[in-house]
Regions:
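Ribonuclease/tRNase effector modules and their secretory precursors
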Residues: 1-119
Length: 119
C-alpha cells in the first residue's frame, strides 16, 4: 500500500515517503486493547480503504505527519496512518469507527476532504 501523490497534493503533505505498512496481528491486539471491537471486521478491508477512501485528512493534533482515511460503510471506518521517519515509511496506527456526527463535523471544519480516486 502507498500514500499516493494525489493524496499528498490534496492534503499538502511534503514527503517522498510513500510505503504504508501494517502488522495485522499487532493492529488487532491494539484494537482489542482500545475497545475498537466494532472495527475489527474491517481489517480485511484495509487495502480497499487506503486505495479508495471516501474522505482523507490530516490529524492536526499530531506533530509528525498523520493521515486519516475514512470509508463510509454501514459504520464509518477511520484508518489512522502515522509516519515512521527512522524506517522511512508510514504505518497503520489504528482503525476505528466514527459516528455520522463526528464525520460531518470533521468535513465541516475541513479536517477531512472528499476524495475521488477518478478525478
Amino acid at each position: 500500500m502507498k500514500l499516493t501523490n494525489k493524496i499528498k497534493e490534496l492534503l499538502c503533505i511534503k514527503t517522498d515517503i510513500e510505503d504504508i505498512l501494517f502488522s495485522k496481528k499487532a493492529l488487532k491486539k491494539h484494537m482489542l486493547k482500545r475497545n475498537h471491537h466494532d472495527a475489527l471486521k474491517c481489517l480485511d478491508n484495509l487495502d480497499e480503504i487506503i486505495e479508495s477512501p471516501d474522505y482523507v485528512g490530516v490529524n492536526p493534533r499530531e506533530q509528525a505527519i498523520s493521515v486519516e482515511y475514512v470509508k463510509c460503510y454501514e459504520n464509518n471506518v477511520l484508518v489512522a496512518i502515522k509516519i515512521n521517519i527512522d524506517n522511512n515509511n508510514f504505518y497503520v496506527a489504528s482503525v476505528y469507527t466514527i459516528d455520522e456526527y463526528k464525520l460531518n463535523k470533521h468535513i465541516r471544519i475541513k479536517r477531512l476532504k472528499k476524495f475521488d480516486k477518478n478525478e
